[in-house]
C-alpha cells in the first residue's frame, strides 16, 4: 500500500518566473499569491480530488465562525462519545481522547489542527451539531458561502469516503478565507507541538503533522493530507 501526500501551499510573494517550468509529480495542483490572487502555477486545478485531512480546514473554520458570533467558546467542554473514541483506536492520526473525557473546544481545535486528530474532529462536530452529519451540513453551507462550487463534505475529518470531494481551486479559496478572516487562530497551524493533558494518564505530546514546517522553506501553516491507495 502506498500513500499519496496532498499538499496545498499559499505563498505570499513568489515570482511567476520561478514556477514557469516546475518539475512536479502530481495529477493536480495550484499555487496562488495570497495578496493579488494571481495564480502562479496550476495543473488541472478543477480535477476532483479526495481532500483527506485538508477537510479539517473547514472543520476549524466552522468552529471559528461560531466563536466569532459568541455561539461557541474556547472554554466550552464536550463529552467524548464512543464514536469519536473509536477513531483513536483505528490507526488514524489521533488526539487519543477517551470515552466520556470532557475536552475543551480549545484543546479539540489544537488536536485537530496540530495533531490532525480524527477523533478530535468527531468530538467537536458532535459537540457543536449533535451529529457528524449535521456538522457536515454546516461545512457544506460554509463552502457554498465561500464559493467552493466543486466541494462536498461528508465528514469532519476527511477520512476515506468517495463522496467527500473537492478541488485544489476550492481548497485554495478555503485556505485564503481562513488566513484572511482568522489570522490569530491561523497561528495554530504553525505550532510544531501539542501536548494533550489527558484525564487519568500521562500527557501525550505530538508534533505537527505538516512536514513542511520542519524544512525551513517559509511555510507558515495550512494542512497536508494523506490517502492510502492500493
Model-derived features: where do they sit?
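Sec-dependent N-terminal signal peptides
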Residues: 4-13
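Active-site-adjacent loops and short helices of periplasmic peptidoglycan-processing enzymes
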Residues: 19-172, 176-180
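Domain-terminus/edge residues, biased toward the C-terminal soluble/receptor-binding domains
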Residues: 148-149, 160-165, 169-230
